């Protein structure tokens, strides 16, 4: 089924310009949303917890900074762009007491709404606007007169004009210049989590580490293994990003292409696909989210333990040494980004 696309011509910018918008959080997405909205003629304040390190950055960018509760009380559209694991407490303590009938509560990711961690009153508009790119790209494209495609979704529409509001917001941050794609909270949440866990973060990390282990255990130098299974990964991903898998296969050598066709299915096979389906089920039925929340409630002990364990893998020490030889590569372990 073909997706439906909307553009600036389909959006009424005056709708969002008639709202007072509080951006909760001033990280990667927060700064881009706030600046793009302001440049589109929208009145914006930033809501942050007291003592937030982001407050000074927001003030330097010319924004009024309020506490989260003050920002929520001032606004009639609240966009929550804080980390997933902080959103429920932010909503309960600071946002919910300051919501009024007809206010809008927007999110950049659907997890908390889809899994009922946040349950706004029925008279509140609940929507999502999610650019498909990091905040710095959303901002840079906007400044250049372009945009990043945006997903929009509606969970509650007590007034009947929630989609028009979401379209207006997405257009104001540049989404309408590239394409605005309607979806659902469920689809955005599940596909996003699955992509992160099975492919982008979890799957890729394990593939790289296992390849490194196979080569080093066979007696090859760790440096050679690092170059072949991690360093060159960016070259391949960039080719896929720019033109798809066919573009990547066209661009590499015949030897690499032929070997990939033969050996790829030996690594990622029918058994792998079944395990990926298990991961999808854990996401769909809430198993993963329950574990995520339990980790937070236990002081992040599971996450911290996993983080420490994974950081000890030999590929990390090898990579840090090699990246120090590459003046064009930023190494966040030794440099301030």
From Swiss-Prot:
A Pfam entry, by short name: KARI_C
Residues that coordinate or bind Mg(2+) 2: 192, 228, 232
EC numbers, comma separated: 1.1.1.86
Domain KARI C-terminal knotted: 184-329
GO cellular component terms attached to this protein's record: cytosol
Entries under HAMAP family matching the protein: IlvC
Family statement: Belongs to the ketol-acid reductoisomerase family.
Protein name listed in UniProt: Ketol-acid reductoisomerase (NADP(+))
Source taxonomy: Bacteria, Bacillati, Actinomycetota, Actinomycetes, Mycobacteriales
